[in-house]
Curated annotation (Swiss-Prot):
One of its GO terms (biological process) is pyrimidine nucleotide biosynthetic process. [2Fe-2S] cluster binds at residues 225, 228, 240. It comes from Thermotoga maritima (strain ATCC 43589 / DSM 3109 / JCM 10099 / NBRC 100826 / MSB8). This is Dihydroorotate dehydrogenase B (NAD(+)), electron transfer subunit homolog. Belongs to the PyrK family. Coiled coil: none annotated.
């Protein structure tokens, strides 16, 4: 990779509607990143900083992977980048790694693009000798990602809202079914915040401890700005330095959901302005 620039996009593939799979050249991130960690990127001098999970690494090639869903201005800008383009800043790896050990029977639950966050965790848990069962959920089969990769390392149960792949329903329906069929020692859930809240309630119903990966608003990624604060066991924590993973049963979900909605109108305005400007420049 001698001729590859730092933070260069080496590979980019569209893997679902509005979901893109990137491999980025960063020897330090690829070497140091552990399952559960993330990077903060900035596309250009006037760009905002956004956190994105490290979905996989190839240390021997100096590459790390990001799977990104277009949800706003910056992720849309990133989706327009081409192979050979570079990202101005990539800071990381940040956050605490997942607590990987041999638990026994482990249930992993991924929703939407959260599936990508689960992948390195699943690989590490498999290498630690765990028996893994994975529930992958999406609105329709067209939004399910990385299914074959998970099938290589775990038993997989698919769930879609419309029944176009696997079970018809939501991921907690699959959790209920699996918890009744066998004993699980621990669970991970990664996906939309509302999904993780209900996964936590379902795990608690069956007495199974659960880890969740939180995605609050984040700016600097070092605990300075305080934007990512969450209440865990009645104490203020920063997702960027204390997390991003926390025990689900300890999270104040209603407060987190309220905070996530705080800037939704501003985010919408910013995105609409960007789309208008982008359209005029074409």
């Amino acid at each position: 990779m001698g001729g590859t620039a730092l933070n260069e996009i080496v590979k980019k593939v569209k893997i679902a509607e509005d979901v893109f799979d990137f491999w980025i050249h960063s020897p330090s991130v690829s070497k140091e990143a552990r399952p559960g960690q993330f990077v903060v990127i900035r596309l250009h001098e006037k760009g905002e900083r956004i956190p994105l999970t490290v979905a996989d690494t190839k240390p021997e090639e100096g590459l790390f992977r990001m799977v990104v869903k277009v949800v706003g201005k910056t992720t849309h800008e990133l989706s327009l980048k081409k192979e050979g383009d570079t990202i101005l800043d990539v800071v990381g790896p940040l956050g605490n790694p997942s607590e990987i050990e041999n638990y026994g029977n482990v249930l992993l639950v991924g929703g939407g693009v959260g599936i990508a966050t689960l992948y390195p965790i699943a690989k590490a848990l498999k290498e630690a000798g765990n028996n893994i069962t994975t529930v992958l959920g999406a609105r329709t089969k067209d939004y399910l990602i990385m299914v074959d990769e998970f099938k290589e390392i775990s038993d997989v149960l698919l769930v879609t809202d419309d029944g176009s792949a696997g079970m018809k329903g939501v991921v907690t329906d699959a959790m209920d079914k699996l918890f009744r069929e066998r004993k699980f020692d621990i669970c991970w859930a990664v996906g939309p915040t509302i999904m993780m809240k209900f996964c936590t309630l379902k795990a608690r119903e069956f007495g199974v401890p659960i880890w969740v990966s939180l995605n609050p608003i984040m700016v600097d990624g070092t605990g300075m700005c305080g934007a990512c604060r969450v209440t865990v066991s009645g104490q203020i924590k920063f997702a960027c330095v204390d997390g991003p993973e926390f025990r689900g049963e300890e999270v104040d979900w209603d407060e987190l959901l309220k905070r996530l909605a705080q800037y939704r109108e501003q985010e919408k305005i910013s995105y609409e302005r960007f789309l208008k400007t982008a359209g005029e420049s074409e």
